[in-house]
Design a protein with these regions (language model features):
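A feature for loop-to-transmembrane-helix boundaries and adjacent hydrophobic helices
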Residues: 1-267
Length: 267
């Protein structure tokens, strides 16, 4: 069965000149759900942070995601364009955010916040890592609603290919946004929910973060095989994509964090 991408308006609603886009709603919802979830996981033994500290970190996380995500996109994906159009860097409403940049932004925010508040950074990061896949799921759903980041032409065996008219052709494609939402969001979220329930893992500071980081890298590399590469980059050497290249270090870093946590188990 071949499906047609259902045309959505990217705007949820408008009041005069003020508009709320689905993409903004995804970010807001992800932050609120993540905040409540981290409040719960941070209180699990060993306690990573107080509820008030989690509340305070919400602002830091928001800045890390937005600034890191935007600058990551500028640096990793279109540095030459933004070098000649620097004022467009602030035009986040035009789209263009990088998870890898957002990840680095939040990492810096965690370290800075934890040093400032005398919190164990890896233990705090472990509890935050549990909530991140839900945000990834919502972000990919927003990508689908916006009709962006569509997939490569689908193989004959794929049961539900989709036609994206905005791609410029009527070729059936993989609904890659939904595939990535399933891998990076649902599957990884289930893995993290199971992992955080093991007290031994919670005492291995950095292990939960490592599971998330490595798990995301694997999910992203897998999902990229279904996704059409960005038109301004195309395929990189050996048929890879920028998303895959940036995810390889994440797998290595994740494995390193798991080993570190196992070796330096906290009391």
């Amino acid at each position: 069965m071949i499906l047609m991408w259902p045309h959505f308006s990217p705007v949820l609603f408008s009041i005069g000149p003020f508009s709320i886009h689905y993409y903004a709603l995804a970010y807001i919802t992800a932050l609120l759900i993540g905040w409540r979830l981290v409040r719960h996981t941070a209180s699990m033994t060993p306690v990573a942070a107080t509820g008030e500290q989690v509340d305070d970190f919400l602002t830091w996380a928001t800045l890390g995601i937005i600034l890191g995500g935007r600058l990551g996109y500028v640096i990793f994906y279109q540095p030459l364009f933004f070098a000649t159009h620097p004022l467009r860097i602030i035009a986040v409403w035009d789209g263009g955010m990088s998870f890898h940049g957002g990840f680095l932004g939040v990492t810096i925010a965690i370290i800075w916040f934890c040093v400032k508040n005398h919190i164990h950074p890896l233990r705090f990061a472990d509890r935050i890592a549990v909530a991140v896949p839900m945000g990834l799921f919502l972000g990919r759903c927003a990508n689908f609603i916006n009709g962006e980041l569509w997939g490569r032409p689908a193989a004959p065996w794929f049961p539900l290919p989709m036609i994206y008219p905005q791609s410029g052709s009527m070729v059936p494609r993989y609904p890659s946004e939904l595939i990535e939402a399933s891998l990076e969001g649902i599957v990884l979220f289930i893995v993290m929910l199971i992992a955080v329930r093991f007290e031994k893992l919670r005492f291995c500071s950095g292990a939960l973060t490592g599971i998330f980081v490595a798990g995301y890298g694997i999910a992203r590399i897998t999902g990229e095989f279904f996704r059409e590469p960005d038109w301004f980059l195309g395929f990189l050497p050996f048929g890879t994509t920028m998303g895959q290249i940036l995810s390889i270090p994440m797998i290595l870093a994740g494995i390193g964090l798991i080993l570190w946590g196992a070796k330096h188990k906290s009391a």
